[in-house]
Regions:
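Membrane-embedded catalytic scaffold of the fatty acid hydroxylase/desaturase
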Residues: 53-64, 68, 83, 89-243
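Membrane-interface helix-loop junction between the first two transmembrane segments
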Residues: 28-47
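Loop-to-helix transition at the N-terminal end of transmembrane alpha-helices
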Residues: 15-19, 42-55
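Short, strongly hydrophobic alpha-helical membrane anchors
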Residues: 1-13
Length: 275
């Protein structure tokens, strides 16, 4: 465990970029070989839009990274945060508790709030407009949402009292998890269900991308599935019934044109339909 801590304490930016690219490339190949759905779409054009948004997220996160670093350093120096108040324990348990709490505050909580607060939903719905969810969809976030999520990540680091090595570890796991859960891949049903008791599985997250309520407002988890089960936001829908997108933006010109996607948060919002 000490070696892992040492690695993430000094992980180069090049390694983080390599993990991002390698993950997308790996799942891209797998979903071509074993697709969950056979989409009739221009895969490269679709990927281009999502990769553009991924790049804007990377730029925003790198530009604001010093805030995250300063927050973590302050928490450690001032013995502030949940982890700093816990008694001595094994490093493995310390890391697990920290990752769970970062996942709760920096991912699950912000995701739920984005669905409940109309102003934040304006930005987050861009992620849901994708009717061809694949591994490139994982970081399909409007730049405005990237700033919102960064703010909650910083809040999570402060409340948890997380050292930076743990933040980098969480972000690395999160990247791979996001690519995995969005990938258009087929897993054996029993395996997917088994995984969903511990982590967010592909089919579990695909339910969240169903185009209509109440399924859109379920399965908010990022890495760990415990939060959806604990807070009653877990839902199941057979994959055969899943239709991707958001019911108010199902037309191709709505969800497959970059210019329009960037403008949607500032346009008059359309009322959702409830089944």
């Amino acid at each position: 465990m000490n070696e892992i801590v040492s690695y993430f304490s000094t992980i180069p930016s090049s390694h983080r970029s390599l993990i991002l690219v390698a993950g997308i490339s790996f799942f891209w190949l797998i979903e071509n070989a074993f697709p969950l759905f056979n989409f009739n779409y221009k895969k490269w054009q679709h990927a281009g839009i999502n990769i553009f948004m991924t790049l804007t997220t990377i730029i925003i996160n790198f530009s604001l990274a010093f805030i995250l670093l300063k927050t973590s350093d302050w928490a450690i120096a001032n013995n502030f945060g949940v982890l700093q108040w816990l008694p001595q324990m094994s490093l493995w348990l310390y890391a697990l508790i920290g990752l769970l709490l970062l996942d709760l505050i920096g991912a699950y909580l912000v995701h739920l709030i984005e669905h409940k607060v109309k102003f934040l939903w304006r930005f987050h719905l861009i992620h849901h407009t994708d009717t061809w969810v694949d591994t490139t969809s994982g970081n399909r976030h409007h730049p405005g949402e990237s700033v919102i999520r960064f703010a909650f990540t910083t809040l999570g680091v402060l409340i948890v009292g997380s050292p930076m090595w743990m933040v980098f570890m969480y972000q690395t796991i999160s990247i791979v998890s996001t690519q995995f859960t969005h990938a258009n891949i087929t897993l054996p049903k029993r395996l997917d269900i088994f995984l969903s008791y511990f982590i967010v599985s592909p089919n579990m997250h695909k339910v969240h991308h169903h185009f209509m309520l109440p399924y859109t407002d379920s399965n908010y988890g990022n890495i760990f599935s415990v939060w959806d089960r604990l807070f009653g936001t877990f839902m199941y829908l057979p994959k055969e019934k899943i239709v991707y997108g958001i019911d108010t933006y199902m037309e191709t010109q709505d969800h497959n044109q970059l210019n329009n996607l960037l403008k949607i948060p500032f346009q008059k919002q359309r009322s959702p339909k409830n089944n």
